[in-house]
Amino acid sequence: FNNLTPRIQRMRLIKSADEVQKMMVAGLYAEKAVKVGFDNISLDKTETDIIAQIDFAMKREGYEMSFDTMVLTGDNAANPHGIPAANKVENDALLLFDLGVLVNGYASDMTRTVAVGKPDQFKKDIYNLTLEAQQAALDFIKPGVTAHEVDRAAREVIEKAGYGEYFNHRLGHGIGMDVHEFPSIMEGNDMVIEEGMC
């Protein structure tokens, strides 16, 4: 028995222009799914109510979700891989959407957070800090740097602000035919970023 998984993962690492186009379309449908979620935010709805609306809307379009849709509110939204439940949407809380759509055999994966009601200054500050960290990674990433270095660019912003202990997850990951592909953008990963990775 020969395990070919590492070879297949390597073959799928660099995407063709056609594959990139398919993932862009999948991303557009993910944006559409998030909009369905935003349009269904109501204090009388639960996390699972909103998930049902999103999943139904995408099925009606003829598409499947690329993984189980997550909508999380309140403290549940702080968990990177929380479990949706019958928690009602909370006023003045954050609502997290983590979802993806599978289109023509290619996946998208998107996370969005929205404030329900008026966010307080702390939530605004954390949002701006997260945006700054994301921008630091986007400004840094290019062919020739390592996945670890990209993660580090964002992580340093969070750490300098005193919130490093709460950055308890990798920065990101590749997508393609599967929702989680290489490269894994995380501490300790010395994989070199190449043109065509997605």
What do the predicted segments below correspond to?
Residues 1-198:
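Active-site neighborhoods and metal-handling regions in enzymes and metal-associated proteins
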